[in-house]
Amino acid sequence: MKIQYLGHSAFYVEAGEMKALIDPFIPETLTHPIFSFADITHIFITHGHGDHLGSTLSIVRESNATVITNYEISLYLQSKGVNCHSMHIGGRTTMDFGTVKMTPALHGSAIETDEGLVCGGNPGGFVIECQGKKLYHAGDTGLTMDMKLLAVEEIDVALLPIGGNFTMDVQDAVRAVAFIGAKVAIPMHYNTFPVITASPESFKEQVKTSQVHILNVEEVYNF
């Protein structure tokens, strides 16, 4: 499995025939993406906030990708002509590339539109399994005891928010790593805005139970 960090909480994930984006809030300043939007097969949306729903609609128009998200966001996107696969918290499903499980998150999920707020259902995260590897994207979340249940998934790589204020801060993200037991932890959702300023180096220093890889924007990690 190959991932490329696209900034904030956005990642490109490639494994076999799957070429996916997670929470595509993607800066226009990207210079070396390892993918073409036209080739994207799937888009995972953890919740409805604009910094996670991102450029989903424009990417789908270019790629005809299937969006995997919760039921309420699916209804909203389907009203815009988007092909969606609906899930909900705790559900696991088999896709053509492997399996997906939707996990709990402590956050909000309202979708902001010109007409007002649209219900975005429950926020979540995803465990994506493909070619014998498991990737966990936590979405935006506070620390929760439910994360201890993820240890049974034997996750290879966990993508965890560390920015605080809206999500876990460094201290709680360190606890989350211990709960989850992933082989590798990668920090995300920090330093995009002043209110979520955090030190990934401090996170790395404090984690004792897993490897930590700090990815620069556009950096690629293979596992």
From Swiss-Prot:
Keyword Hydrolase listed: yes
Family matches, as SMART domains: Lactamase_B
Protein keywords: Hydrolase
Domain of life, source organism: Bacteria
GO molecular function, one term: hydrolase activity
One Pfam family, short name: Lactamase_B_2
HAMAP family assigned: UPF0173 (MF_00457)
Family (UniProt): Belongs to the UPF0173 family.
UniProt xrefs under NCBIfam families: PRK00685.1
Name the record gives this protein: UPF0173 metal-dependent hydrolase Amet_4625
Organism: Alkaliphilus metalliredigens (strain QYMF)
